[in-house]
Amino acid sequence: MNPATLTALPTSDTTLRTLFSIGFLARFSYALARNPVLPLFAAALGAGPEGIGLAVGISTVTGILFKMPSGALSDVIGRRRTMLAGLVVFGLMPFAYLFITHYAALVAVRFLHGLATAIYGPVAMAVVADIAGARKGEMLSWFSSVGIAGTLLGAPIGGYLLFLLGGEQAGLNSYRTVFLCSALTGAAALTLGLFTLRNGDKPAEGKNLAQRIHLFTQGIREVVADRRVLMTSSMEGIQNMSMGALEAFLPVYAVSMAGLNVFQAGLIWGVQIVVTFIAKPLMGRISDRWGRRPLIVAGMLLCAVPFALVPHLTDFVVLMLVGMVFGLGEAFVTSSSAALVADFCKARHYGAAMGTFGTIFDVGHAAGPIVTGLLVASLGYGAAFAIVSTLLCASIPLFLYTVREEPQTANL
C-alpha cells in the first residue's frame, strides 16, 4: 500500500466495517434529501419540469467534474484526509437546505452537496481496493451493496416523512424537517468517521508542493493513458446508461403504455434494485475466483436482452421477471468492473483509477435518460430501446479485444 494511504488505520477488517457503516449512513442521508423529496421541493419553490430535472441532475455534474481529481488527490495527500473532507460535506451541507427559499439557491446547494459523493466515493473504493487483496471483487461489491441498502431505505423513509408532514400540500417547513433528518444522519456519518479514522495518514517524506503536484498529475496521466482502464470503465458507463434510461422511462412506459398503475411500476423498478443488491457480493466473490471478463460480458448480455424486450411487454409479472434479469445483469457487470480496473493499476494510483471509473460511471448515468429521451421522442419506445440494447452488445467485442485479464499480483 502507498505510505500516503491508510497505513495508520486499524486492522483491515475493522477498516472495512467502518467504511461500510459510514457508507450506509452517508448514502441514507443523501437519499433522504433526494428522491422523492427533492423534486417535490423544487416544484414547491416554483420550478418547472426543466428546473426540476436540473436540480436533481446537477449533483451528477459535480461527480463528473470532481471524482477523478479527488481520487488522484488521495493518492498524494492520503486517503484519510480526503475521505474526511467528503464526510464534512455529507455532515454539514444538508443543513444548508434549511435556509433555502429560492430555486437558484437549491441548485447551488445541490451542486455543492454532490461533492460529498464525488470526494468520498472513489477514495473509499480505493481504500477497499488497498486492503482487499485478492478479494477486491467481493469487498467492492459489499461496499456498493451497503450503499444501495442506504439508498433503498432512505428514499421511502424520506417520502413517508414528507407524507406524514403534509404530502403534496406540504409547506417549506415540512421539507425542512426531512432535510434536518438528512443533516443529522450525515452528521452521524461524519462523527463516526472522525472517531474511527482518527489516526493520521503517514506523511510522504521529502515531498514539497511541486513534487506533490507532479505526483497528482502523473497519477491521472498514467491512469487515463491505460486503455484497459478506460475500456473497462466504459463498460460500466454503458451499462449505467441503460440503467439510467430504465430508471427514467420504465415507470412512464409501464403506466402510459402497458396500462399498469404507479405502484406496480414502482415494484418493477424496485425488484431490479433488490436483485442487484443481493447478487453483487456473490458475483464479486465469483469474479475473484474465476475471472472478471466473463462476468462483465455475460452481464452486458443479461442487460441488453431484457432492455430490448421491455417495449414489447405489457404483463406485470413478465415485466417483473424482465426487471429481475436486468438486475442480475447489472450485478454481473458492476461486481467485476471496478475490481478489474483496480487489478490493472499500481496500488499507488488506486485513487486516480477509482476516480476515473466514477467519472465515466456518472457520464453514463447522466447520458442515459437524455439520449433515450431524445430517441423515444423521435422513434418511439421500441426503436429507442433497441438502439441502446445494440450499444450494450456492440461494446462486448471491443472490450474483449482491448482488455486482457492479468494475474492480480501484477499491480503490487
Regions flagged by a language model, labelled:
Residues 2-13, 198-232, 412:
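Juxtamembrane intracellular "pre-TM" segments in multi-pass secondary transporters
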Residues 11-60, 230-235, 240-258, 265:
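Helix-loop boundary and gating motifs at the non-cytosolic
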Residues 57-71, 270-282:
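Central cavity-lining transmembrane alpha-helices of secondary-active solute carriers
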Residues 78, 99-105, 133, 259, ...:
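Helix-breaking motifs and short loop linkers at transmembrane-helix boundaries and internal kinks
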Residues 109-148, 339-340:
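Cytoplasmic helix-loop-helix junction between adjacent transmembrane helices
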Residues 183-205, 395-403:
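C-terminal membrane-cytosol helix-exit motif in multi-pass small-molecule transporters
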